[in-house]
Amino acid sequence: MKTVKQVLENKGYQTHSVAPGATVYEALQKMAREGIGALAVLEGEELVGIVSERDYARKVILTGRDSRETLVRDIMTENVICVSSELRVDATMSIMTEKCVRHLVIRDDEKINGLISIGDVVKAIIDDQQFTIEQLEHYISGHG
């Protein structure tokens, strides 16, 4: 089973972030531009939260707020769940399922190495299972 590090090597180590004082609208523009669903919220180098499309839907749209006037700090999730890049992908999926989150911050030795989404995790698991199936088919057909 792949590790988070292997997923990041394929995906890239870029950490997309936003400042807590940015507007939600600015954060949404960045997410749309990058094709992602969440941003790390950094105050300087310090991780202070995570903001996602889900935060926007629940804390801005459903409450009638204006994304151009609401600040990221007002809707971000402060208790960020971080995992090591050495964690296996299946363990990562278990954490996401247990905690009901779709994004995790990857942090090693206090350094943020990226974000991983449930989509990244599912793709890695499917790729791993496909490889296993191909190996079994090869073995069964007598070529192994």
Predicted regions and their residues:
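Short, charge-rich amphipathic segments
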Residues: 22-33, 64-75, 110-111
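Tandem CBS (Bateman) regulatory domains
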Residues: 1-13, 52-81, 88-97, 117-144
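Short, flexible active-site loop motifs that bind/organize anionic cofactors or intermediates
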Residues: 14-17, 46-47, 62, 82, ...
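The conserved cystathionine-beta-synthase
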Residues: 17-35, 82-100, 107
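Charged, low-complexity, helix/coiled-coil-prone segments
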Residues: 1-3, 31-42, 74-84, 108
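A glycine-centered beta-loop-beta connector
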Residues: 31-34, 39-55, 96, 104-119
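A positional/architectural concept
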Residues: 3-48
